[in-house]
Amino acid sequence: MSSSDVELQENKRDKLRSAAMKGKWSEVIEMYKQERDIRTVAITATRDNVLHMAVSSGDAKVVADIVDFVCAERDVVLRAYNDRNNTPLHLAASMGNVEMCRKIGDADPSLVTRCNIAGETPLFLAALYGNKTAFLWLHYLYIESPEVSSTDFSHYMRNNGDTILHCAIAEGHFDVAIEIVHLYKNLVKEMMMRRNKVGLTPLHLLAATPSAFKSTCLHGRSILVCLIYGFFRVEEKKQATMKEEVEQCERKSRVKFYQEIGFYQIRKMKEKHTWCLQIMNELLQHASDEDMSKIISRIPSEHLSISLEKEEDNESESMATPVPGTIIIETPLMIAAKTGVKEMVEKILELFPTRIKDVNDEGKNIVLLAADYRQIEVFRILCKQKRLTESIFRQVDKEGNNALHLAAMLGVKLDSLYHGETLSMLREIKWFEFVKNSMPPGLSERYNRKMETPDDIFRHSHKELMRSEREWLNQTSQACSVVSTLVLSVAFAIRSNVPGGYDGSNNKGFAILRNNKVFKWFEVCSSGALFFSLISTICFLSIVASRSQSVNSCRYVPFIRLHFGMLFMFISIVYLWISFCAGDFFMLDDDTLHKALPSYVVVSSVTILLVVTQLPTFLGPTLASISPIQAPRRKTTHPIEYRRAKEKENNIDLNSQD
């Protein structure tokens, strides 16, 4: 080819790319008709052709026109791939555009099994990106193709060992995951046992996703959300969505009214929890005791090496120190205990009761892990297990720490706590006492290898937190005591000088306006302001006067007194304002009173609203002291950082274009 021909070809390519980038598809199709040699040419830096770009634009009509037009070169155009070996069907599947998938797939069904550079088929990408309808349609297109083997597993797995079930669970697409479980019943056991190159099974990923389970996701939600959550009824999915149902869903688009007011998200959350639990049960039904007992050790390198280590009864072998730099992937039971997935802990112990004896590389069993990661619900379940012997609770880790030692540790950095978070110490104390009361007697006096008892660890680790909260408590009490004293002084002055004065004719000192109805309001509110301001002042002064720095000084009432004092102070301010308004009623004429009335209403509403909105803050410590134990805040990370590792390994951006 001469230089002039090369230059002409480049000009055609630039013109074609410019028209496609600007969305001038009529010009592109016209050039397609006139220039046969540019139909498969790569026009972007990622070696995308025009059909790749048309799919990425999302215009299904343009894609259909191009596919229909190039029927003579259909095999060449449709199978053209970019620098990542992605065909147009790969892009359509990743976008979830069913219409484009149908058009391209019907033209060449063999593209469904075409792999890109990472070993991902269009079917795999549809599952990876949670495009349920596209996934189902590609699945039915594939199984209806001739020469399809029901035992062929290669199309459902990519190069790093991830199956479609791995990806659907890791990405949180549980609507796709439950379809996979039903569609590939004969492959579920193989998928469940399949470990990727990192050493993870789908059950590991499920255990590391606490938000997918009701017990952990609803924790801390508002009462309203919980009520709406309970209102919805979601049934378990008994079978996969049939092809006819997929076609019906594709034809109709339904938008329910509750999508607009937020109910839709709550329903989706309940669907996720229901299907996730169903997936967990299906996977565990196909698991074996050997699968549940394997701990993976791997040394990070360019080519990951995986060694399987089955735990033995010999404690010294199971607690052997791993090679420095070795990454340990624990059993699903241990991961579930760390993340607080009580549903999985219960089910595994029900099906595989001997797994209660498993320990990780640090010598911790699930009782120690639940205490270390402060998973209260898991700890409660373990305490209720009748099959657990006392030795399970008395077990210690490599450092000689029992469950009470681990519960006594602070478990969170002080800088991660909100300044003045007064419930922190209260929660820490209640958590420690809860574990102490749940454990066999005598553990509180046990020493670890550093010769520390649980009480020693608690005092030492919480010393700074206690000092910080005590300092904040004193400063807040001093500031509030000044305000409450001022309110007390004003309330006393108002109560002593009633509107209209006193009747001295009978030497009894009765108020002249005592029979007026508005005066009754003044009398009650001024007395209330005096009473509540006096109590709040006493509460604040009692806190300031108490200088004890021991742990026991934070165990009971300081925070409750502070918040009760603040509550009474705000109530006294409200009463003071009402008595002031009632006093003005006697001093102003009717015309002035009517003009001032809107101002009184606005200020009164703002004052009352302020008190009402602050009620949770005032009553929080009191309710916390009588409510069931809540775990103190802890900064945790998931045992499995799957998504980041996956993206780094594959480094795939399907939509990248120049």
Question: Where do the PLM segments sit?
Answer:
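Acidic, Ser/Thr- and Pro/Gly-rich low-complexity regulatory segments
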Residues: 1-485, 496-518, 540-554, 558, ...
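Alpha-helical transmembrane segments of multi-pass membrane proteins
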Residues: 480-491, 522, 526-533, 561-582, ...
